[in-house]
Amino acid sequence: MRRLGLAVLLCLLLAVSATAAPFVEGEDLTPATKPVRGGTLYLALTASPQSFLFYGSLDNNAYTVIGQTMTGLVELHPVTNAIRPGLAESWETSPDGKEVTFHLRDVKWSDGVPFTADDVIFTFESFIMNKVAKGNSVDRFTILDTRDGQKKEVRWVKVNDKTVKAVLPSPFGPFYMNLSHAYIYPAHKLESKIDKNRPDSVNELWLTNVSPKDIVANGPYRIASYVMDQKVVLERNPNYWRVDRFGNQLPYFDKLEYLIVKDAEVRLAKFIAGEIDYMAVSAADFPTLKQKELAGGPFTIFKAQPTQPTPSPVHIAFNYDVTNEQLKELFRNTEFRRAMEFLLDRERIIDEIHNGLAIPGAGLVLPANKAFYNPKIEKIMRPYDPAKAKAMLDKLGLKDKNGDGIREFASGKNVEFTLTVQSTPQDYQDVALVFKEDLEKAGIRVNLQILDSTLVGQMFGAGNFEAGIRAFGNQPDLELRKAIWQPGTQLYYWHYSALDRDKLAAISANMLDWEKRVYELFDLGSITTDPTKRKAIYDEVQEIYHDVVPVIFVCKGMNLSGANKSLGNVTQDKEGIVYFATYTAFRK
C-alpha cells in the first residue's frame, strides 16, 4: 500500500528525531517516464479570492490559490495526508517531548531572497498567534500545561539563521499536523508594512489589488496576474526546491490558471469542452459524465470513497442562543434534537440528491480514517422513524391542540422556526427542502430562508439565526477541527454564549454538562501523545456527538472528480484513491 496509515504516522511523530528528507518527490506522485515540461494547467474557482494572504482571510477560494504558492515547515502529502518535511528538512524532538528543533532548508523565496529563521518567527508572531488576524491559528498553538492546568502558547526561538526551536508547554500529539497548516510568510516583504499600533492591519496585506510583483512565494507556483471575476494566473516559482526522480525541477507546467466560474453549469460545460483540466464532479452530473466517458469522451471520471476534506459533509444546527426564549429552551433539549434526527431521511437524501453517491453521517471522522474512526457511532446514529419522532415530540408537550396540523408550545404559540441555508451548492437547498417536508408532516412549521453564501456566513458568524444548514470539511486529525467542534471556540457557532469573543476564551459556566465533557476531551486529546490513548479520547467525542446530537450530520459525498485525458500523471490506485497534484501533473 502506498498510503501511510494515520496510526503509523502518529507513531512516527513520537520518534526522537526525523531524518533529513531528500528534495526528490516520491514515486507515487511522479511519472514512471520523463514527462514533457511546459504549458498551462487550467482549473476553476467558484468565486474570486478575497486576499492572497492566508492569515488575512476566511475564504476557501483564497485558500485554494494560496495552497499553490505557500508551504510550511512540514507538509501533508497531497493525497495520503502523511506528514513529511517541508521548509524544514529535518527535526529532532527532546526526550520529554517539549522541545522540537527544526533545521531549515537552504532555499530562496521566489524573488531570490534567502529563506531564514526570521521568516518563521515573523510568521508566528505577526499572523499565526495574532488574535485579530482573520485566519489566525491561536487555538492550534495554545496548549494545556499539565503542570498547572493553564493554557499557554508555543514559544518559538531562533537558534541561528537556519535553525528554529519550538518550546511546548507539554507534549502535544497533533503538533506536526497543526504545523502542516501553518504557511510561512516573508519577513522582508511584509514586516515593515504592519502597523505595530494596529495588529489588525495584517488583514490589509496582500489584498487582491496588490501588484503580483510585490507578492513572493515559497511553494511550487507564484502569482503572475489577477483579473477580478475572471482568472488568477500562477507561474512556476523559479526557486522551488522540489525535483522529480529524474532531477527535473517541479512543477512541470509553466503556468497554472484558475478560471473564476461562479455558475456550476458553466463550469461543467467548460470541463466537457476541455477548457478546465481537472475538477470536482457533482453527484447529479456523475452519471451523465460517466456515460460520455464510456462513449469516448475526452475525459476520465473518477469515483472513490470519501478520504478528503471536500466535499464537506452537511449538518443541521439549532441555535442554542436564539432570541426566542421558547425556541432556545427547545433547541437546548437533547430529546428534541434526537427527535429531529429521527425525522431526517438520510436514505432519501442520498438516493435522490446524491444519486446514491454518498455515505450517511461522517461528520467528525471519515470511515476511511482508520486511525480515528469509531464504528460504534453507526449503531448510535438514528434512522428515519417519523412515528418515533412524533411520540418524542408529544412527550415534550408539543402537541397540535387546535387541529390545524401545527404543534403548539404550552403557551399556545406554534412550534415553528426559520431554517437558513445558502443558495449554493444546490444540494444544501435540496437537503433543506427534504428536511422541511418531513418536519411539517410531523407538525413543526419550517420557514425556509435561502440567501447568498457570504450573507449566510456572516449571519452564522454573528449567531444571528434560528436553525441552519452548513458544512465543514473533514480533516485527518480531529485536532484540526478543534476550533469547530470544541465548545467555546470560534466556529462553534450554534452556542456562542460559551465563548468570550473578545478574549477568545471559553466560558465553562455557560456550557451544558455534556459540552463540558467534550471540551475536556478535546484538551486531553491535544496533550496525549500515545496513538491508542488519543483514539480512545476521540472515540468518546464521536459517541457524545452522535448521542446528544449537538448538530445532525446528514451525509458525506463520495470523492467524484474528472480529468482531461490530455492531462498526464493522474491515476487511481487499487484502493480507489486518485493521485493528482498540480505540481506533478503535465500535458501529454
Predicted regions located by residue number:
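N-terminal lobe/hinge region of extracytoplasmic solute-binding protein
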Residues: 22-27, 41-95, 125, 216
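Surface-exposed binding/hinge segments that line
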Residues: 139-199, 227
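Acidic glycine-/aspartate-rich tracts in secreted/extracellular proteins
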Residues: 48-49, 107-108, 171-172
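Active-site-proximal polar cores
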Residues: 554
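A structural "hinge/loop" feature
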Residues: 28, 46-64, 87, 113, ...
